[in-house]
């Protein structure tokens, strides 16, 4: 009851929500036949404050919230070493994409100039940072993100993943919030592996090549995808969630092995004459050749012209040098060395990898041609026995890794606390 009479006959007012009397709270605010106390108001404010960030994240990005290209590149620099040209291209493309969405929301449908979407194609060797760039962008912009492997996709009706499964995974990653999903980022890896197998498309049925490209084309250019609610399987009588993919940013990536030969052959044909500057194939690195890429090269490689046209922004990533790999080991916010130092620190042990050890790790990754992706397995292999035995050992203060540990698989040097004190 909002009000009651006390023993002395005075009218005592009560909070309609928590039931406390006017004597138990600081303030009681009256409304039409209801009362609310200051404590309930504070509780309501806390609830609203907790929900606002989630609403804002799902809502429209304001211009002030959107970092400019130079800020995007600076943030990418903290996680991705090198690849400056690719980072600049990506920063501009992502900024323009979300600026376009803001423009569409502000101007409405009556705007004369319609801004088209610019999806992105990343070309670079294995372990050069393609996936990490896309992941970092999505995390930075606080938008839903999903990675899809193009090699697992098949045409509808065949065994394998349907292309619409990509959108279903995107929805799952944002708790089935349709508005958020429609502004997300999709990264399709190994796009080069679904290239057309022959110049004549009518030779055989290519269920994991050109057919998948055609299916992806619809998603990339914008379509209404039908997705079962909460991850259910499709069946005829089911209600589907309709997702418009028009404003989803698609980033496709691949190593495109052999594309450099296609580009080199074209450039050799065009570079004939007295004024042509000729460089031998041995003098040109793969990254140098990739920088001369034209859409016709991708078509010759086996990507259908329609899909090439829907990926107008092309960013090429170079092969990582030994110095770049050493930087990747030590410099980024989540650098591999920092991660292992933290793991050893949990056992009260300091981990030191000497410069010679870092160089040996980088050289091994270069020999394996695995790029930055192969660094973890090399470090893991070198430290496996130590990590197995260390928790049961007493008195170890420091583990030191040098080039012998990496090259010859010898045990790292263990420094005990007594030795550390004596040397100090």
Swiss-Prot record:
Binding residues for Zn(2+): 15, 18, 37, 40
Keyword ATP-binding: yes
GO CC annotations, alphabetized: HslUV protease complex
Lineage: superkingdom: Bacteria
Residue ranges constituting the ClpX-type ZB domain according to the UniProt record: 3-56
Signal sequence extent: none
Family named by the database record: Belongs to the ClpX chaperone family.
Function: ATP-dependent specificity component of the Clp protease. It directs the protease to specific substrates. Can perform chaperone functions in the absence of ClpP.
Protein name: ATP-dependent Clp protease ATP-binding subunit ClpX
Organism of derivation: Leptothrix cholodnii (strain ATCC 51168 / LMG 8142 / SP-6) (Leptothrix discophora (strain SP-6))
């Amino acid at each position: 009851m909002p009000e009651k009479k006390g023993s002395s006959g005075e009218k005592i007012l009560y909070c309609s929500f928590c039931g406390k009397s006017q004597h138990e709270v600081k303030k009681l605010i009256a409304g039409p036949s209801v009362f609310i106390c200051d404590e309930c108001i504070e509780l309501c404010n806390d609830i609203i404050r907790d929900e606002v960030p989630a609403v804002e994240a799902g809502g429209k990005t304001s211009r002030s919230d959107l970092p400019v290209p130079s800020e995007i590149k600076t943030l990418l620099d903290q996680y991705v070493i090198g690849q400056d040209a690719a980072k600049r291209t990506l920063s501009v493309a992502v900024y323009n994409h979300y600026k376009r969405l803001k423009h569409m929301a502000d101007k409405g449908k009556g705007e004369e100039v319609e801004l088209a979407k610019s999806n992105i194609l990343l070309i670079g060797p294995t372990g050069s940072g393609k996936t990490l760039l896309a992941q970092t962008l999505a995390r930075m912009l606080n938008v839903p993100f999903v990675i899809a492997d193009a090699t697992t996709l098949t045409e509808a009706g065949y065994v394998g993943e349907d292309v619409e499964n990509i959108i279903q995974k995107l929805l799952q990653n944002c708790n089935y919030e349709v508005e958020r999903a429609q502004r997300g980022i999709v990264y399709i890896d190994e796009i080069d592996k679904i290239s057309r197998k022959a110049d004549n498309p009518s030779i055989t049925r290519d269920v994991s090549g050109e057919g998948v490209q055609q299916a992806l084309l619809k998603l990339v250019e914008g379509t209404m995808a039908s997705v079962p609610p909460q991850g259910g399987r499709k069946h005829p009588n089911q209600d589907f969630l309709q997702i418009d993919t028009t404003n989803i940013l698609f980033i496709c990536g691949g190593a495109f092995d052999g594309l450099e030969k296609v580009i080199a052959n074209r450039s050799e044909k065009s570079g004939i004459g007295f004024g042509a500057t000729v460089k031998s194939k041995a003098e040109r690195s793969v990254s140098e050749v990739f920088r001369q890429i034209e859409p016709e090269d991708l078509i010759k490689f086996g990507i259908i012209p329609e899909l090439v046209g829907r990926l107008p922004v092309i960013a090429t990533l170079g092969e990582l040098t030994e110095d770049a790999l050493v930087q990747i080991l030590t410099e980024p916010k989540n650098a591999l060395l920092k991660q292992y130092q933290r793991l050893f620190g949990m056992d009260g042990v300091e981990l030191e990898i000497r410069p010679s050890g870092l160089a040996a790790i980088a050289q091994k990754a270069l020999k394996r041609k695995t790029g930055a992706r192969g660094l973890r397995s090399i470090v893991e292999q070198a430290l496996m026995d130590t990590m197995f035995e260390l928790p049961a050992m007493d008195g170890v203060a420091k583990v030191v890794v040098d080039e012998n540990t990496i090259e010859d698989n010898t045990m790292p040097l263990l420094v005990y606390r007594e030795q550390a004190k004596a040397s100090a």
